[in-house]
A protein has these predicted regions:
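Bacterial signal peptide processing site
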Residues: 7-11
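Extracellularly exposed regions in secreted/surface proteins, prominently low-complexity, repeat-rich
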Residues: 25-40, 131-179
Length: 179
């Protein structure tokens, strides 16, 4: 499940002109522009936070508590993802997307590289922040019997997600039984 960018107005404060709104749609547009500029692979998976495609099927009404929480969390999120066969140079292209986002005033923070398995699978995660939003840019390459790549840019509005109780966040993240 993906969670991401949000529900706040993102207005400026103080005397002078207000900063333009930075909301879910703006975050999504910046993600998509960075993906396209970097040349990341085309994804047939739905993005989160962009305009609803004309003629799309409405989402079903949530029937469980977890589904209701997921529906609430969607308004806090903007995301793009690719899951599929490996594409040459995609990790470097993710780095280019991060550079493009930094050019849009996202501030790059922590960078982690983690070994996933003994077959050479790794995960790269770069954290970015902008105006109350946190984004995780991730690239995962798995080298096992089914070789695949997962690439995602996932932004979440902090104030929007803070509206969830600790118990609701655990349920969203699948930790309810463990915590």
């Amino acid at each position: 499940m993906l969670l991401g960018a949000g529900c706040g107005a993102g207005t400026g404060s103080g005397g002078g002109a207000s900063a333009p709104a930075f909301d879910r749609e703006t975050a999504h547009a910046e993600i998509v522009a960075a993906v396209e500029k970097a040349g990341l692979p085309k994804s047939d998976l739905p993005g989160i936070g962009g305009p609803t495609p004309t003629g799309s099927t409405p989402r079903p009404t949530p029937s469980t508590e977890r589904e209701r929480l997921e529906e609430r969390a969607l308004v806090c999120t903007a995301a793009w993802q690719y899951v599929g066969p490996p594409v040459d140079g995609s990790r470097g292209d993710l780095e280019k997307a991060v550079t493009a986002l930094v050019g849009k005033d996202w501030v790059q923070g922590e960078r982690q590289v983690e070994k996933l398995d003994e077959h050479g699978g790794t995960m790269l995660q770069i954290t970015l922040r902008k105006r109350g939003w946190v984004m995780y840019a991730r690239h995962t390459g798995v080298q096992q019997s089914l070789t695949m790549e997962m690439i995602s840019l996932h932004a979440t509005e902090t104030a929007c997600m803070n509206r969830f109780t600790e118990q609701e966040r655990k349920a969203l993240l699948g930790d309810a039984e463990q915590g």
